[in-house]
Regions:
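AAA+ P-loop NTPase nucleotide-binding core of proteostasis motors
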Residues: 1-57, 61-70, 74-201
Length: 201
């Protein structure tokens, strides 16, 4: 995991540094870390940011809600990064944002109530991850008339999302076993039980 993340972060900053050819635009790549709680995902990101000397903002996806509801809206993630950069926009635009518990904002199934912390948060995060201009307050985490606003471009911000994704292996096994055939040459149901690369299928 350390090697893969290091290479991913290296490629990201190499892309930022190699913008001498304006005709060639390389799309940004973000990262997804899967691992159980307490496996060191946050520590790994903190160490990387410290070594690279770039601002880091860590947020919990479960605390994010749609704008206008109690809780942090999606843009507050960029506000935290701007604060970590000492309100230096240029520095913040090269920082790292780590969003933990990303698996907890999956769309709720079979519910008629408004999903203020699920799909709407996903849509808001998608806009940030792809790269967009976000208006954020300077020196505060929420917008109000007394606080000046500044624009931060998320095009060069590295977003790393982390989550435990429980039962993901069961979902993948169920999908792979649907392709199984019948007869003497059919795949066994437990064929993927000991597959170390199951999560990559």
């Amino acid at each position: 995991a350390k090697k893969v993340i290091s290479v991913g972060v290296y490629n990201h900053y190499k892309r930022i540094g190699n913008q001498s050819e304006p005709d060639v635009e390389i799309e940004k790549s973000n990262m997804l870390m899967i691992g159980p709680t307490g496996s060191g995902k946050t520590y790994l990101v903190k160490t990387l940011a410290k070594l690279l000397n770039v601002p880091l903002a860590i947020t919990d996806a479960t605390s994010l809600t749609e704008a206008g509801y109690i809780g942090d809206d999606v843009e507050s993630v960029i506000s935290k990064l701007l604060q970590a950069a000492g309100n230096d926009v240029e520095k913040a635009e090269r920082g790292i944002v780590f969003i933990d518990e990303i698996d907890k904002i999956a769309k709720k199934r079979n519910t008629n109530s408004r999903d203020v912390s699920g799909e709407s948060v996903q849509q808001g995060l998608l806009k940030l991850l792809e790269g967009s201009n976000v208006e954020v307050p300077v020196g505060a985490t929420s917008k109000n008339a007394m606080v000046p606003l500044t624009t931060v471009n998320t095009q060069n911000i590295l977003f790393i999302c982390g989550g435990a994704f429980p039962d993901l292996d069961k979902i993948i096994k169920a999908r792979l076993n649907k392709q199984s055939s019948m007869g003497f040459q059919a795949d066994l149901k437990d064929k993927y039980d000991d597959d170390p690369n199951l999560l990559q299928k």
